[in-house]
Regions:
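Short, polar/charged alpha-helical segment
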Residues: 41-72, 109-110, 162, 305-308
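A ligand-binding cleft/hinge motif common to bilobed small-molecule-binding domains
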Residues: 98-110, 160, 165, 192-212, ...
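Conserved C-terminal helix/tail region of periplasmic/extracytoplasmic solute-binding proteins
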Residues: 311-358
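Short helix-initiation/N-cap motifs at beta->coil->alpha
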Residues: 75-87, 100, 168, 173-188
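Flexible hinge/capping segments at coil-to-helix
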Residues: 131-146, 237-240
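Secondary-structure end/capping motifs
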Residues: 43, 238-322
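Short, well-ordered beta-strand elements
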Residues: 29-54, 71-77, 144-148, 174-176
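Pocket-lining segment of extracytoplasmic ligand-binding domains
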Residues: 176, 182-274
């Protein structure tokens, strides 16, 4: 009888565990994952391009990953770019985001509790555009001119260094804080004399309403921008398993980009959902390695790029104090995802100079 009683007790215990544990796990999962992106497409479209996070959004990969769990994915594409993303983190309204180097550095230096989870892009090209009928032929000609840049963004940091290269500082121009879509309209109407931005200026040039007077393609990478995938430290600590799945999905998007290395046309076509042109993406990425530039690895090159940018941001007065980059990095989720997906050999780690090891 006692043996039979013990069997019933074990059976009932098994039923309780089977019911209670999944319910407890479900109760501990978030109802939604709040994703942020520093920018919008043409006409404020909620879409972006150029990296794995943007590609993951366009392909609906994160939604597919969490659909079976009933966890919603809420994306915020912000006209205010990097500073607007930091504002959401400051108010605990965001869980993960792509973020350019300067705004993420500013956020960390000012005390935001974020962690860097994966690389996203290096050597992002910067362009300087002027109206088509402008007499300006060089960045050196911008002294005293009305120059637009989205302040607090990765482009802003690059702009400061590009101006220096031509003997100028921000004080030598009339620097106007202006997001991309507004700057595009202002170039067309002649309300500004020049603007710093990305490959979107190539499409405007092709329409015959602007000229590109400077571009970083093929030049010194110190004038280019970088971005990473970061997360809210509170969310990461509370939901490590969810964080692991998010990072794994980012990695899957990066793998898809790497697989298009030899024939990137499907990537450019996908990215046109932003409203920017296929031709502008193709030109911007000509002679560039998509696999190299969108590597998710947190390797010595990413360390070197960000340590340099932290120093430059301090030198140019964009942050008041620096911080230890190593303490910001949280590589365990990326490393676990690389092992799980057996992708340890897909991307070669790059040394401090940017050369692939091996």
């Amino acid at each position: 009888m006692r043996l039979e009683s013990n069997k019933w007790t074990a059976w009932l215990l098994a039923i309780v565990i089977a019911i209670v544990l999944p319910a407890r796990a479900l109760a501990d999962a978030p109802k939604e994952i709040r994703m942020g992106y520093p920018g919008v497409g043409v006409g404020n479209r909620p879409a972006a391009a150029g990296n794995a996070v943007a590609t993951m959004h366009l392909r609906g990969m994160l939604e597919d990953e969490f659909k079976k769990d009933g966890i919603a994915i809420r994306w915020s594409f912000l006209r205010g770019a990097g500073p607007a993303v930091n504002e959401l983190y400051a108010n605990n309204l965001l869980d993960f985001s792509l973020l350019g180097d300067l705004p993420s550095i500013v956020g960390r230096a000012s005390g935001l509790h974020t962690r860097l989870l994966a690389g996203q892009s290096v050597r992002g090209n910067i362009y300087v555009s002027v109206p088509a009928d402008s007499p300006v032929r060089s960045v050196a000609d911008l002294r005293g001119k009305r120059v637009a840049v989205a302040k607090g963004t990765a482009t802003h940091l690059a702009a400061g260094k590009i101006l220096e290269q031509f003997g100028l500082t921000e004080k030598d121009v009339r620097l106007i804080n202006m997001e991309n879509n507004v700057a595009t309209a202002a170039i067309v109407t002649g309300d500004i004399d020049a603007a710093f931005g990305g490959s979107n200026w190539l499409g405007l040039r092709d329409q015959g309403v602007s000229r590109v007077i400077f571009r970083t393609t093929g030049g010194d990478p110190k004038f280019t921008s970088n971005s990473t995938f970061i997360g809210n430290e509170e969310f990461i600590k509370r939901y490590p398993e969810i964080t692991q799945r998010v990072v794994k999905t980012v990695l899957l998007a990066a793998r898809w980009l790497a697989e298009q290395e030899s024939k990137p046309e499907p990537v450019y076509q996908l990215w046109t959902r932003t409203g920017f042109t296929y031709a502008s993406y193709k030109e911007d990425w000509t002679n560039e390695s998509m696999k190299y530039k969108t590597s998710p690895l947190i390797d010595p090159y990413l360390y070197a790029r960000y340590e340099f940018q932290i120093t430059e941001a301090k030198r140019l007065g964009l942050i008041r104090q620096t911080f230890d980059f190593k303490e910001w990095v949280e590589p365990r989720f990326l490393e676990a995802a690389l092992r799980e997906l057996q992708l340890e050999k897909l991307w070669l780690p790059r040394d401090e100079s940017g050369q692939p090891k091996g």
